[in-house]
Amino acid sequence: MKTIYSVGQVNRYVKNMFVQDFVLKKIYVKGEVSNCKYHPSGHIYFSLKDETGLLSCVMFAGHRRGLAFSMKDGDKVVVGGTVDVYERDGRYQLYAREIILEGAGALYERFLALK
């Protein structure tokens, strides 16, 4: 007989796989900021993108105190943190602990040139 799993069981299993991966525990990712939203709770929700992909990210209010600039769409940044699964939604994302500004992103500049 086939083993049938609940959605929650699958999400928990996938989360455990992420937790066990030592590369994802402390990773730095370079990209351009997109869809940057400052939540009333103090959290920052944003995406990192490049020519080949998109990665959902969040910086919780407690880590935001160390942010030395006001992040916005189009910023080219390096984000340090942990990639993990938000178990309820089954979505993986980068939980940012550190964000370093590198300047304006080329993708955003090309977008502005088209306007």
Predicted regions and their residues:
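Acidic, two-metal ion nucleic-acid-processing modules in DNA metabolism proteins
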Residues: 1-115
